[in-house]
Design a protein with these regions (language model features):
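Beta-sheet-rich sandwich/jelly-roll-like modules and their strand-loop junctions
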Residues: 1-77, 103-113, 117-169
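Short beta-strand segments
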Residues: 39, 84-86, 99
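Solvent-exposed serine/threonine-rich low-complexity stretches and specific carbohydrate-binding patches
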Residues: 80-92
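A short local loop/turn or secondary-structure capping micro-motif enriched for an aromatic residue
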Residues: 91-93, 124-125
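Aromatic sugar-binding surface patches on proteins
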Residues: 94-101
Length: 169
């Protein structure tokens, strides 16, 4: 995990680049569930969020990928209202690439916890993730996943999506 402070230009303020496995989101043909994923993070500085990137390992076929940004209450594990959202189109050319989600500018505050959720109604996408040691979990947030059948959220400190949070200071 890397945090960097720059001047007044867009920069990756928080990034987790390591990946040694993947998490599938979207709809698998083998069952009725839609799989969702996300990542919580503690913001390292004040700034205007303009872009989040995630690393895609595979895209099964062309479709939509939707990202929503939320405030997150880490004590109660509660997702707040949507602060910003964006829907992009992905296809096989996005395989093994950083996919950008350009967001309407949102002011984030240092040390507050936020989170983003990813879903797809019509394709299956493998998002890069890192598996950490249970004795040395990811320090800046938790990976989240769920499906539309169970109505149960799962949070993991020892997993993290591969992501970049870009801020303008």
């Amino acid at each position: 995990m890397k945090t960097t402070t720059f001047g007044n230009h867009l920069h990756p303020a928080l990034e987790q680049l390591h990946r040694n496995t993947c998490l599938w989101i979207g709809h698998m043909n083998s069952g009725p569930a839609d799989h969702l994923a996300g990542q919580t993070f503690q913001c390292p500085e004040d700034g205007s969020l303009n872009n989040i990137q995630v690393y895609t390992i595979a895209v099964s076929h062309p479709g939509k990928l939707i990202l929503t940004l939320h405030e997150f209450d880490k004590q109660r594990k509660n997702w707040g209202q949507v602060l910003s959202s964006v829907e992009i189109e992905v296809d096989e050319n996005d395989t093994e690439n950083w996919v950008q989600f350009p967001l309407k500018s949102v002011q984030l505050h240092k040390d507050n916890t936020y989170g983003f959720r990813l879903k797809s109604p019509d394709t299956l996408v493998a998002i890069g993730e890192a598996a950490w040691s249970s004795t040395s979990p990811f320090a800046y947030g938790e990976e989240w996943n769920a499906n539309n059948i169970e109505s149960k959220d799962h949070y993991y400190r020892y997993f993290s999506l591969a992501f970049k949070v870009e801020l303008r200071a």
